[in-house]
UniProtKB/Swiss-Prot annotation:
Binding residues annotated for Mg(2+) 1, in chain numbering: D7, H142
Organism: Anaplasma phagocytophilum (strain HZ)
Main location: cytoplasm
Protein name: Crossover junction endodeoxyribonuclease RuvC
GO cellular component: a single term: cytoplasm
């Protein structure tokens, strides 16, 4: 099973491609963050997210995506911008016929860490240990959250040991 994990954001969109082998072993094929801070225009940011994710989808031939649901922020404008980034992310998936699974941030944390209130550091630790990565493995918190989204789908789709 190949899963495309997404952590959408207007300035930083994390992504990850995680493979679960039939044996149950997990591999991180690639991960990264699409940074749009150099774009001053909202439309440019959205196009950058869409085109960047579309290229990754094509490169890895992904057919399943796991994405964080929107959470309500105290700042309505921030929530609105997050929705724009999610829309660009969803459109990239839909335009390539990628099946989308959505999970709340709490569900992702609970599924991956066992606690829905896990910190970014705790999630990063579990992500590294689940994938057999060293403590030196470096990626952004956005990429870590995208990996966690992919792992959540894998763990929710059956036993992580392939039994």
């Amino acid at each position: 099973m190949l899963v495309f994990g997404l952590d959408p954001g207007l300035n930083y969109t994390g992504w990850a491609v995680v493979l679960k082998e039939p044996s149950g072993s997990l591999s991180l094929l690639d991960t990264g963050t699409i940074c749009t801070t150099s774009c001053s225009d909202l439309n440019d940011k959205l196009f950058c997210i869409f085109s960047g994710l579309s290229a990754i989808i094509q490169k890895f031939s992904v057919s399943v995506a796991s994405i964080e649901n929107v959470f309500v922020n105290l700042n309505p404008k921030a929530s609105m911008f997050l929705c724009y980034a999610r829309a660009a992310s969803l459109l990239a998936c839909l335009s390539s016929n990628v099946k989308i699974f959505e999970y709340s941030p709490t569900k992702i944390k609970k599924c991956v860490f066992g606690n829905g209130r896990a910190s970014k550091e705790q999630i990063a630790f579990v992500v590294r240990s689940s994938l057999g990565l060293s403590e030196d493995a470096s990626f952004s918190s956005h990429a870590s959250d995208a990996i966690a989204a992919a792992l959540c789908h894998i763990f929710s789709s059956g036993n992580r040991y392939g039994i």
